[in-house]
Amino acid sequence: MTPTIVEFLFDFGSPNAYLCHKIIPQMAANTGAQFEYVPILLGGLFKLANNRSPVEAYAHIPNKLAYERMEMQRFVSKHGLTAFQRNPHFPVNTLHIMRGAVAAQKLHCFERYVDTVYASMWERECNMADPQVIAAELDAAGLDSQAILATSQEPEVKARLLTNTQ
């Protein structure tokens, strides 16, 4: 029987995507499904759908945002995701790190790149919009930041991210 393949469209700037990333291995083990990670630009997707992020859309509704935070905390507690921290730099411009994800696919270091960037963003509270911080975090994880950042500037990589987003 052919396993179910689930496309996981993600942007590192979404705390919900981080939380999903953390439980995907268990979901895969429980169901036999395979998860295909697809880097996108969430802000671009919101624009294409003529929509806004929940933080922006519900900024004037304090109870809605408070409830969202409460539900997120319930999820974190239920799944034992104690490393999760709200990033003080949120919302973060993720263009560099999302292009980096496509570059990491091309360079065959995608899984480690994804784990590193998610941990940097949502566990270590790093400003992952800053290219110097990005390079330092990748280097600390044993990844070749120079190769990833250089590859992320290639027209093919930029085009793939846009295609993924559409």
Name what the model sees in each region.
Residues L19-M121:
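Structural alpha/beta surface segment adjacent to cysteine/selenocysteine redox centers
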Residues T2-Q34, V38, V102, C109-R112, ...:
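C-terminal cap of thioredoxin/glutaredoxin-like
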